[in-house]
Structures are given as structure tokens and as C-alpha cells.
Amino acid sequence: LMNKRAVVLYLSIILGLVLIVTGWYAASFLTYTSESVPEGFSGDRAYADVQTQVDMGPRTPGSAGHAQIREWMRTELESAGWIVEVHESERLGHPIYNIIAKRGEEPPQIILAAHYDTRFFADNDPDPAKHTEPVPGANDGASGVAVLLELARTLPADTTPTWLVFFDTEDNGRVEGWDWILGSRAFVEEVPIQPQAVVIIDMIGDAD
């Protein structure tokens, strides 16, 4: 599993980036400094969310873990007071379920996004024996989701209009019949919004 110290560090860095971005639109954030973290923001809780996802098993498209994580994310987001919608689409014959969390019907000025699916094959693993096994997805998948969920719990309700988007079917390029970033491409092509800023959170749990 990914390095816990790295998770806590990167959570703080990413939160700083988020508040700086939102500060372009909301004067209340102009006093933010890199040393300050909102009360209740927990790196330990985010790390636990990573473990929860890994315990579901691979979240490859169409798998039991893939369905389970969607329901779990919905529960966590709704518990934090967000409205949850599913953007359904299809690319290359594969169903897509992008999860959108928002606080109201106002179009977003900012989108914070991560992908939640995992890769069918660990073809970049240093151990060739694992190249045909699915990726556990602690770093590549779960870390970004954990950050967004913790932001969902701690972002102020009166912040700049923001959507949290959890992209599906992003991670299986170089697999026959698949391609990279299918979910985010479908979202961009089909959801008629024009945010001023987009922050993608991905693979933030490496030790380095």
C-alpha cells in the first residue's frame, strides 16, 4: 500500500492548490497560507479511504468492485451534504459511469476530478509474473478518490461553485478493445459546462 506520510503531505499540498484556485474567484480565500489546513481535514481518514477501496478488490470496469465503489462513493458524498448524479455514456462498446457531486444547480466554476477505475493488467509491474494480474489501484485510482472524498467533507459550503467528478474507464489504454481516458472524454463531449479551472488529482501516493 502507498506511503502514509506521502498521503498526508500531498493532501495538504493539494488542498493548498484547491484553495488558491478557488481564491481567484472568492476573496475569502485570499488569506490562505500553505501552513493552514481547515479544521477537520484528516490525512489519516483519507488513508483509511484508500484502504477501504483496496479491500474491495480490483475496480476494473464491469467487476463487482467497480459497482461497489460507485455505491460507496455515493454514500460518502451524500453523507457530506453533496448532491450526487451519474453521467452515463458509452465508448467503444463499454458503459461509462462518471460520478458527479455538486452542492446546487449553479454551473461549476471549478472542477476537481480523479478517476476511480483500475487497470486490468499490471503490465508495468517490476515483477513479470504480475503482468497478467489486475492492478490493486492503491496509488493509481484510490489515492485521488480519497483526496476528493476528504475535500467533500471539508470544503466550505459557501465556496466558489465547485463540482467533484469521479471519472470512469480512464485507465485501460494499451488493452485490446479499450483506450485511455474514455470517461473524461465522454464527460467533456456530453456535459455542457465551461468551468474556469479544472484540477486533476491522480497518483499522489508515491513515496517520492
Predicted segments, located by residue:
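Solvent-exposed loop/turn segments at secondary-structure junctions
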Residues: 60-61, 90-92, 105-107, 116-120, ...
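Second-shell loop/turn segments in exported
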Residues: 34-40, 54-65, 86-90, 131-142, ...
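Acidic/histidine-rich catalytic neighborhood of metal-dependent amide-processing enzymes
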Residues: 133-208
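Active-site histidine-acidic residue metal-binding/catalytic motifs
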Residues: 114-146
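N-terminal Sec-pathway targeting helices
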Residues: 2-16
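A non-catalytic alpha/beta surface segment that caps or lines the substrate-entry region
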Residues: 52-106
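Hydrophobic alpha-helical membrane-insertion segments, chiefly the h-region
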Residues: 12, 16-28
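N-terminal capping segment at the start of a domain
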Residues: 25-70, 206
